[in-house]
C-alpha cells in the first residue's frame, strides 16, 4: 500500500479505538516519517510498540486508557517529544523511565489515573515542564526539590491523592495558572503559598478539609483568579479571603455548613456562576441583587422560604439558570419572572402553592421543573395570545378576515372584543428593561425615517422617469437587477463584503469555492471565477470579476463560468463588466491580482454531462442485525456465512436477494426487504429485481453467486456479536502535510434538530457531523467509506482516497473489506445505515410560532414577509362564522316528500336472517332493529324529455292526414319509451356487524346488477345517518327498536320511544331509548309500551304528549300508535300531567324530575375539528346529527346556546386538542359579539364522561358501541 506515497506527508493520525492487543501494531506507521502527533488511546496496548523509534519528529504521544505497565522502550530516543499522555493505565513507579525527563522539549506529562505511590524520580530535571497531571494516584508526599526547577508550570493537578502537606517551594510557581488539589487530606496545610502565585486563574480545593482557620487571610494579590472551588468542606461561612478577589467569575461553595452570606458579596461584580447548594442557608442578602453579571445561581437543598429570597432579584438581568430545589419555598418573588434571559428554573421538592402569573412571559424559558409540589396550582395562561399556536393566528379579527367577512364586520368584532385592559400588560412592560426599550424606540425611529426617505426617493425616481423623453435609451447598467435565481447556496451573504480575493471552480455545472491556500493554482481542464473586492477612493466597495478558461476545458465548463460570472455581478449589484481570461493569454490586470504568481496543473474535474457506460456492480453479501433500526454487516461471499437465525442480503447489482433463515424473525425480514427497496430506488433507478428466499427454497442463481450450496447451514455467529464501533476521521490538508484526527462523536448531539434542554451524549453517528466543505473517512472495520463534501477542495479529495486505501491495508481486516467512495447527496444506503436517523426529507418545524419566524436571522422587507407567509400553517375556521342552517318548514318538507314518493314506482324490502337476505313482510316496513341489516330495492320512474311543442304539433298534423288505426299506431311508435332507475339502499344498525354488508356485496348486489345492468345505484347508510329521500318513503313513520328482529323471547320489559324531528320533518324518527322517566321532555312526544303477563291482554301502549310539544307531532304520535304497534295491545293517548299511576309510572320505573323545555333545539350546532385534510380545518355537521358523528380521533364542538362543549375522543392527538381549544375560544368570542344576550361558557367533555346537558342534544343517546368486525 506504500505505492500511494502519502504516508511520508502525514503529520498526525488518531488510531484510537483499534485493537492492538497481542503485540500487533501496524508496520506502516514507520513510513510516517513526518509524524508530529500520534494518538493510540483505548487500543489495548500492554507495552509501547517498537515502531515508535522510527518517528523521530514525533512531538505528541497519547496512549491513554490502555493496559500499559511500563513506559520503558523507545520514548527517550525521540528527541522532539514534547507531550506524553499516559493516563488511565496500570503504571507504577518502576514503569516510568528516568531518562524521559532528560528530553529537552518535554513540556506536558499526564500520568493520572495510575498506580503511582510517589512522584517519578528525576522529574525535577524536566525544567521545561508546563503541564503536570499526577491526579488519581496514591502519592502521599511531594519532594521539596520538585518545584525548585519546575518554575514555569502553567497547569498542576495533584487531586485525589494522599497528600497531607504541600512543599513550601510551591511559592516559586509564579506562572502557575491552574492548581487542582481536590480530594487530599490537607487539614493541617495552611496554603500560605497561594498569595505568591500571582498568575493563578483556577483554584480547586474540593474536599480538602478546609475551615476558616486553614485558609489564607487574604488573596488580594491574586488579581487573575476567576474560578474557585471550595465545595465539600467544613466552612460555616464564606471565607473573608474570597471577598478580596477582584476577578472572581465562578465560585462553588456547595456541600458546606454555611448558614448566612455577608453583605460583602456585592464586591463580586464579575461573578457569573455561584453555587451555594447543600448548605444551611435560610435567606439571601439583598446585596446579591447587585451581581449584575450573574448567570447561574444554584441554591438546592437549603432552608430557604419565600421571605428568604430578596424581592429585588429581578435586577439580575443576565440570570439564565436559577435552581432552588429541596427548600421550603411556598412562593417565589414576582420579580424573578422579570429576568428576561432566564432559561432554566428548577423548584422541585418545595411547598409551592402557586407561581406568579408572569411566569408565562418568560420567553426564553426551556426548563421549568416544579415536580413534587403537591399543593401547586399553576396560574392561568394569559388570554388572546394570538399567532402562538403552531404559527396560526387565532385572533377573531384575522379569522373573520380569512372567512371573507366585510371590513365593517371585522371592525365591529374588534370593538366588541376589546374589553378592559389586560392585567398582565404591566408585567410584560416590567419584563422589558429600560435600556432595551430605549434601543427599540431608537431602532423604530431610524426605521421610520429610512422608510420615509426610501419612499420619497422612489417617488422622485418615478416622477423623473415620467418626465424623461420616451425616446431616450437607458444605459445597460441601469437595467441591472439581482437575479431571481437562488444563488445563496453558491454565493454566501458575505461574498464581496470584505476586501480580498474569492475564487470559485466550476464543477458539475455549479461554482465551488476554492480554499485560499490554492489560490493561483489552476487546472488546465477547468474554469474558474475570480472576484476581487477592494475599496475605491471614496471608501466604497468595488469589484473586479474575471472568469478564467483552461486550455483543455470542456464546453459546459466554459459556458457555466461565463453565466455564473454574470449572475455574480448581478447578485452583488456591481457595475463592472465580467472579463474573460484564457489560459496562457492572461491580461496584466489579472496577473497583478496574483502578484504574477500563477501556476498550471494538469487534469481537471469531469464534465457535468452524463457519459453512457455500463455500471459495474460489486457482488457483496450482508448480515442484517439490529431491532429498531437495522444495520448491515458485510460477510464473506460463500454459503458457510449463512446462519439460520439471521436475514442476509445478497447484492448482485440488478439482482438483489433477501434470504431468510429458518429461525429469523418476520420483523427483520420485512425491514431487510424495505432496505432492498431503498437500494433499488436510490441506487439502481428501480431496475433491480428483488427476490425473497426462504431457507430450503433457494434458487440456483443464489448458490451460484455464493460458490455452491454448503452441506449444512450452521449457527456460527456468537450470541453477543456486535461489530466494532465505527471511527470517523476528518481529513486535514495543509501546506505539505496531511492530518487524520478522529471525531469523538460519542459526545456529539443533534444540535440542529434538538432543543438545548435535550442535549444528551449520544454514542451514535449523526448526519449533522458531516460538513459539506470537508472530507471524512468512516472506518467500520469491514468497510471503509470516504465521504466527499460537495464544497470540499479537490486536493483534499485526492488525498483522502489515498489515505483510505492506506488505512484499509494498515489494520488487520477480513478479506472482503472494501474501500468505497460516497459523494454528498448520492450516498449508498449501506453508508446511511451507519448513521442515526439519516434523513433525506426536508425538515419542516410545524411547532414554530410567529415570534420565532419573526426572529429568523437574515430576513428583512419583502423577503421577511414571504418567509412569514411560507412558514404559516394553513387553517380553515370558516365554518365557525357561518350562520346556523335554518329549519325546513313543514309545508316544504311535505311537498318534497310528495314529489319523491310520486317518482317511486315500487319498493321491496329484505332483511338479513342468518347468512341470507329474506324478503321483509310489508307489515314490518318502517320497523328497524339496531342489530340487523336491511336492503330496500327502490324503482324510480324517470320523466321523459319530450320534443318541443312546435315539432309535436307538426307530428300531430301529419298523423291526422293518415287514416284510422294505421296513423294512430305509427304515432304511438314514435313516442319515447318511459325509463326507470333502481337504487338499492343498504341500512345497517349501529350494533350490527359489517358481515351484513359483506354478505350483501357478494350475493344480493350481484343479483341486482345482473337484473338491472347499467341502471343500479347502491347507497350504504347507517342508523340515524339515512338519506332524506329514503326517509321520505316512510312518511315520518320510521321506528328504530333495540336488539334483533327475531330475538329469543324472554320476559318482556317496558320500552320507551322518543319521537323527534331534527331540522326538517323529513328527518323524523321514533327511536327506542332507555326506559327512564328522567328522559321525558315537555316539548316532545313519547311512546311507552308496557307488556302484561296476562294471556288475554298483551299489554298497553301509551302515547305521551308533552304540554309544550308541537301539535303536528302530537297527531303523528297518535298515528304511529294506532298503525305501527301491535293490535293485541290496548292503546291510549295521554297528555302530560294526566298519567295513570297504576300502569304508566310503574311501567316507566317511578316518576322522576325531567326537563320541561328544549330551547337548545333552536341553537344546537355540531362542529368537527380535524387534520385529515393535511391542515387544521373545522367543518359543521348538518342539523340531523347523531351520536355516531362523534369521531373518536377528532375533536367535536357542540353549541347548545348556553355552553360550548369541547368533546375529546380517546385517540385524539395533542396537536388537535391545542388547535381545537383555540378554535373554540374564537367561536365563543365571535358568538359573544353576535349574540351578546346569550354568552357561552366553555366546557370540556371526554368520551365516556358526558353529562345530561350534553347527551340530550343527541336523539336516543346510548352507550358507545365497540368496533365490530
Swiss-Prot record:
Signal peptide range: none
Subcellular localization, as worded in the UniProt entry: Nucleus; Cytoplasm, Cytoskeleton; Cytoplasm, Cytoskeleton, Microtubule organizing center, Centrosome; Cell projection, Podosome
Tissue: Strongest expression in skeletal muscle with high expression also in the heart and lung.
Residue ranges with Acidic residues bias: 966-975
Region annotated Interaction with LRRFIP1 and LRRFIP2, chain positions: 1-427
Sequence ranges of Basic and acidic residues compositional bias: 453-465, 952-965
LRR repeats: 7-32, 33-55, 56-78, 80-103, 104-126, 127-149, 150-173, 175-196, 197-222, 223-245, 247-268, 269-291, 293-316, 318-339, 340-363, 365-385
Effect of residue 603 to S: No change in binding to ACTL6A or in coactivator function
UniProt-annotated stretches for the region Interaction with ACTL6A: 495-827
SUPFAM superfamilies: Actin depolymerizing proteins, L domain-like
GO molecular-function terms, A-Z: actin binding; actin filament binding; phosphatidylinositol-4,5-bisphosphate binding
Domain of life, per lineage: Eukaryota
Effect of substituting residue 586 to K: No change in ESR1 binding but reduced binding to ACTL6A and reduced coactivator function
A single Gene Ontology CC term: nucleus
Keywords for the protein's UniProt record, in alphabetical order: Acetylation, Actin-binding, Activator, Cardiomyopathy, Cell junction, Cell projection, Cytoplasm, Cytoskeleton, Disease variant, Leucine-rich repeat, Nucleus, Phosphoprotein, Repeat, Transcription, Transcription regulation
Gelsolin-like repeat placement: 509-591, 629-703, 758-831, 1075-1143, 1181-1254
Modified residues (N6-acetyllysine): 21
Any one biological process term the GO annotation gives: myofibril assembly
Annotated region described as Disordered, given as residue ranges: 452-473, 951-975
Classification via Pfam families: Gelsolin (PF00626), LRR_1 (PF00560), LRR_14 (PF23598), LRR_8 (PF13855)
Sites of Phosphothreonine modification: 818
Subunit structure: Interacts with actin, ACTL6A, NCOA2 and CARM1. Interacts with LRRFIP1, LRRFIP2 and MYD88. Upon LPS stimulation, LRRFIP2 competes for MYD88-binding. LRRFIP1 constitutively blocks the interaction with MyD88, even in the absence of LPS. Interacts with the nuclear receptors ESR1 and THRB. Interacts with SGK3. Interacts (via the gelsolin-like region) with TMOD1. Interacts with (via the gelsolin-like region) TMOD3. Interacts with LMOD2, VCL, GSN and DES.
Function: Is a regulator of actin polymerization, required for proper myofibril organization and regulation of the length of sarcomeric thin filaments. It also plays a role in the assembly of cardiomyocyte cell adhesion complexes. Regulates cytoskeletal rearrangements involved in cytokinesis and cell migration, by inhibiting Rac1-dependent paxillin phosphorylation. May play a role as coactivator in transcriptional activation by hormone-activated nuclear receptors (NR) and acts in cooperation with NCOA2 and CARM1. Involved in estrogen hormone signaling.
Disease: Cardiomyopathy, dilated, 2J: A form of dilated cardiomyopathy, a disorder characterized by ventricular dilation and impaired systolic function, resulting in congestive heart failure and arrhythmia. Patients are at risk of premature death. CMD2J is an autosomal recessive form characterized by onset of heart failure within the first year of life.
Protein name: Protein flightless-1 homolog
Organism: Homo sapiens
Name of the gene this protein is made from: FLII
Amino acid at each position: 500500500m506504500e505505492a500511494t506515497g502519502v504516508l511520508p506527508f502525514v503529520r498526525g493520525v488518531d488510531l484510537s479505538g483499534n485493537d492492538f492487543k497481542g503485540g500487533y501494531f501496524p508496520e506502516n506507521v514507520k513510513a510516517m516519517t513526518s509524524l508530529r502527533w500520534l494518538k493510540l488511546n483505548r487500543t489495548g496496548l500492554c507495552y509501547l510498540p517498537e515502531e515508535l523509534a522510527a518517528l523521530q519528529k514525533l512531538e505528541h504521544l497519547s496512549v491513554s486508557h490502555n493496559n500499559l505497565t511500563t513506559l520503558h522502550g523507545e520514548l527517550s530516543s525521540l528527541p522532539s517529544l514534547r507531550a506524553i499522555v499516559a493516563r488511565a493505565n496500570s503504571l507504577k513507579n518502576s514503569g516510568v523511565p528516568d531518562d524521559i525527563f532528560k528530553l529537552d522539549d518535554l513540556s506536558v506529562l499526564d500520568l493520572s489515573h495510575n498506580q503511582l505511590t510517589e512522584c517519578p524520580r528525576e522529574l525535577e530535571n524536566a525544567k521545561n515542564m508546563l503541564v503536570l497531571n499526577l491526579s488519581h494516584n496514591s502519592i502521599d508526599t511531594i519532594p521539596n526539590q520538585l518545584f525548585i526547577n519546575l518554575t514555569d508550570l502553567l497547569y498542576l493537578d495533584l487531586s485525589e491523592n494522599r497528600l497531607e502537606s504541600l512543599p513550601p517551594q510551591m511559592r516559586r510557581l509564579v506562572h502557575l495558572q491552574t492548581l487542582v488539589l481536590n480530594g487530599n487530606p490537607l487539614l493541617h496545610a495552611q496554603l500560605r503559598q497561594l498569595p505568591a502565585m500571582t498568575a493563578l486563574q483556577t483554584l480547586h480545593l474540593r474536599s480538602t478539609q478546609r475551615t476558616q482557620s486553614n485558609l489564607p487571610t487574604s488573596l488580594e494579590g491574586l488579581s487573575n483568579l476567576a474560578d474557585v472551588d471550595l465545595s465539600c468542606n467544613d466552612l460555616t461561612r464564606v471565607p473573608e479571603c474570597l471577598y478580596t478577589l477582584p476577578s472572581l467569575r465562578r465560585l462553588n461553595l456547595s456541600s458546606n455548613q454555611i448558614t448566612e452570606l455577608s453583605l460583602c458579596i456585592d464586591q463580586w461584580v464579575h461573578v457569573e456562576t455561584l453555587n451555594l447548594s447543600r448548605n444551611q442557608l435560610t435567606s439571601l442578602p439583598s446585596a446579591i441583587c447587585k451581581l449584575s453579571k450573574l448567570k447561574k445561581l444554584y441554591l438546592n437543598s437549603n432552608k430557604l422560604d419565600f421571605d428568604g429570597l430578596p424581592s429585588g432579584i429581578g435586577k439580575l438581568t443576565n440570570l439564565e439558570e436559577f435552581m432552588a430545589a429541596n427548600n421550603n419555598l411556598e412562593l417565589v418573588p414576582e420579580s424573578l419572572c422579570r429576568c428576561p434571559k432566564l432559561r432554566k428554573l428548577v423548584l422541585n421538592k418545595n411547598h409551592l402553592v402557586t407561581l406568579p402569573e408572569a411566569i408565562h412571559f418568560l420567553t426564553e424559558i426551556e426548563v421549568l421543573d416544579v415536580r413534587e409540589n403537591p399543593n401547586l396550582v399553576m396560574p392561568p395562561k394569559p388570554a388572546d395570545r394570538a399567532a402562538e399556536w403552531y404559527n396560526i393566528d387565532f385572533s377573531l379579527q384575522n379569522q373573520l378576515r380569512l372567512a371573507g367577512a366585510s371590513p365593517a364586520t371585522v371592525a365591529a368584532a374588534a370593538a366588541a372584543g376589546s374589553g378592559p385592559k389586560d392585567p398582565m400588560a404591566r408585567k410584560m412592560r416590567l419584563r422589558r428593561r429600560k435600556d432595551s426599550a430605549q434601543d427599540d424606540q431608537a431602532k423604530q425611529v431610524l426605521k421610520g425615517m429610512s422608510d420615509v426617505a426610501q419612499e420619497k426617493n422612489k417617488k422622485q425616481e418615478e416622477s423623473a422617469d415620467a418626465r424623461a423623453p420616451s425616446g431616450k435609451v437607458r444605459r445597460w447598467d441601469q437595467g441591472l437587477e439581482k437575479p431571481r435565481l437562488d444563488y445563496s447556496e453558491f454565493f454566501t451573504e458575505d461574498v464581496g463584503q470584505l476586501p480580498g480575493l474569492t475564487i470559485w471552480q466550476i464543477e458539475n455545472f455549479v461554482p465551488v469555492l476554492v480554499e485560499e491556500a490554492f489560490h493561483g493554482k489552476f487546472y488546465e481542464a477547468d474554469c474558474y471565477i475570480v472576484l476581487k473586492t477592494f475599496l475605491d477612493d471614496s471608501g466604497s466597495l468595488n469589484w473586479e470579476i474575471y472568469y478564467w478558461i483552461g486550455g483543455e476545458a470542456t464546453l459546459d465548463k466554459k459556458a457555466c463560468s461565463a453565466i455564473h460570472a454574470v449572475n455574480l455581478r448581478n447578485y452583488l449589484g456591481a457595475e463592472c463588466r465580467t472579463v474573460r481570461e484564457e489560459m496562457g493569454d492572461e491580461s496584466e490586470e489579472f496577473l497583478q491580482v496574483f502578484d504574477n504568481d500563477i501556476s498550471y496543473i494538469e487534469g481537471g474535474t469531469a464534465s457535468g454531462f452524463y457519459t453512457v457506460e455500463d455500471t459495474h456492480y460489486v457482488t457483496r453479501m450482508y448480515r442484517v442485525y439490529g431491532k429498531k433500526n437495522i444495520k448491515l454487516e458485510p460477510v464473506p461471499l460463500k454459503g458457510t456465512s449463512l446462519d439460520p437465525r439471521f436475514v442476509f442480503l445478497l447484492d448482485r447489482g440488478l439482482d438483489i436477494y433477501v434470504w431468510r433463515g429458518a429461525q429469523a424473525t418476520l420483523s427483520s425480514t420485512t425491514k431487510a426487504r424495505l432496505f432492498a427497496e431503498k437500494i433499488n430506488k436510490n441506487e439502481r433507478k428501480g431496475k433491480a429485481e428483488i427476490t425473497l428466499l426462504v431457507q430450503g427454497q433457494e434458487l440456483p442463481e443464489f448458490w451460484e453467486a455464493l460458490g455452491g450450496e454448503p452441506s449444512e447451514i450452521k449457527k456460527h455467529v456468537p450470541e453477543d456479536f456486535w461489530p466494532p464501533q465505527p471511527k470517523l476521521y476528518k481529513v486535514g490538508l495543509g501546506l505539505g502535510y496531511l492530518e487524520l484526527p478522529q471525531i469523538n462523536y460519542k459526545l456529539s448531539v443533534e444540535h440542529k434538530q434538538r432543543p438545548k434542554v435535550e442535549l444528551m451524549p449520544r454514542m451514535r453517528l449523526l448526519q449533522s457531523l458531516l460538513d459539506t466543505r470537508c472530507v471524512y473517512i468512516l472506518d467500520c472495520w469491514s468497510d471503509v467509506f470516504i465521504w466527499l463534501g460537495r464544497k470540499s477542495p479537490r486536493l483534499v479529495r485526492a488525498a483522502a482516497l489515498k489515505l483510505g486505501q492506506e488505512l484499509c491495508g494498515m489494520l488487520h481486516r477480513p478479506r472482503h473489506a472494501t474501500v468505497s467512495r460516497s459523494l454528498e447527496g448520492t450516498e449508498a444506503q449501506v453508508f446511511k445505515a451507519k448513521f442515526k436517523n439519516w434523513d433525506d426529507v426536508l425538515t419542516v418545524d410545524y411547532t414554530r410560532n410567529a415570534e420565532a419566524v419573526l426572529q429568523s436571522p437574515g430576513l428583512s422587507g419583502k423577503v421577511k414577509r414571504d418567509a412569514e407567509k411560507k412558514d404559516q400553517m394553513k387553517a380553515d375556521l370558516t365554518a365557525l362564522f357561518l350562520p346556523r342552517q335554518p329549519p325546513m318548514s313543514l309545508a316544504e318538507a311535505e311537498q318534497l316528500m310528495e314529489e319523491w314518493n310520486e317518482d317511486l314506482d315500487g319498493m321491496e324490502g329484505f332483511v338479513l336472517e342468518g347468512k341470507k337476505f329474506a324478503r321483509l313482510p310489508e307489515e314490518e316496513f318502517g320497523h328497524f332493529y339496531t342489530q340487523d341489516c336491511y336492503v330496500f330495492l327502490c324503482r324510480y320512474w324517470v320523466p321523459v324529455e319530450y320534443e318541443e311543442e312546435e315539432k309535436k304539433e307538426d307530428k300531430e298534423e301529419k298523423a291526422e292526414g293518415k287514416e284510422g288505426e294505421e296513423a294512430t299506431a305509427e304515432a304511438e311508435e314514435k313516442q319515447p319509451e318511459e325509463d326507470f332507475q333502481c337504487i338499492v339502499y343498504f341500512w345497517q344498525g349501529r350494533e350490527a356487524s359489517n358481515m351484513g354488508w359483506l354478505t350483501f356485496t357478494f350475493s344480493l348486489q350481484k343479483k341486482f346488477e345482473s337484473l338491472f345492468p347499467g341502471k343500479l345505484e347502491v347507497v350504504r347508510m347507517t342508523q340515524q345517518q339515512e338519506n332524506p329521500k329514503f326517509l321520505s318513503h316512510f312518511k315520518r313513520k320510521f321506528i328504530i327498536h333495540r336488539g334483533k328482529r327475531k330475538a329469543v323471547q324472554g320476559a318482556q320489559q317496558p320500552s320507551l320511544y322518543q319521537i323527534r324531528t331534527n331540522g326538517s320533518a323529513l328527518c323524523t324518527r321514533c327511536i327506542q331509548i332507555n326506559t327512564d322517566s328522567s328522559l321525558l321532555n315537555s316539548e316532545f312526544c313519547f311512546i311507552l309500551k308496557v307488556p302484561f303477563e296476562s294471556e288475554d291482554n298483551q299489554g298497553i301502549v301509551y302515547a305521551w304528549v308533552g304540554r309544550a310539544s308541537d301539535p303536528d307531532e302530537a297527531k303523528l304520535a297518535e298515528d304511529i300508535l294506532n298503525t305501527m304497534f301491535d293490535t293485541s295491545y290496548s292503546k291510549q293517548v295521554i297528555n302530560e300531567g294526566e298519567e295513570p299511576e297504576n300502569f304508566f309510572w310503574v311501567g316507566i320505573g317511578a316518576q322522576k324530575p325531567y326537563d320541561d323545555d328544549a330551547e337548545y333545539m333552536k341553537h344546537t350546532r355540531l362542529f368537527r375539528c380535524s387534520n385529515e385534510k393535511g391542515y387544521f380545518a373545522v367543518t359543521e355537521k348538518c342539523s340531523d346529527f347523531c351520536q355516531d358523528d362523534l369521531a373518536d380521533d377528532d375533536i367535536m364542538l357542540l353549541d347548545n346556546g348556553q355552553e360550548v362543549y369541547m368533546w375529546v375522543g380517546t385517540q385524539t392527538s395533542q396537536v388537535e386538542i391545542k388547535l381545537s381549544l383555540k378554535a373554540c375560544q374564537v367561536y365563543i368570542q365571535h358568538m359573544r359579539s353576535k349574540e351578546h344576550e346569550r354568552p357561552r361558557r366553555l366546557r370540556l367533555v371526554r368520551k365516556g364522561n358526558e353529562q345530561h346537558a350534553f347527551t340530550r342534544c343527541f336523539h336516543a343517546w346510548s352507550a358507545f358501541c365497540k368496533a365490530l368486525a
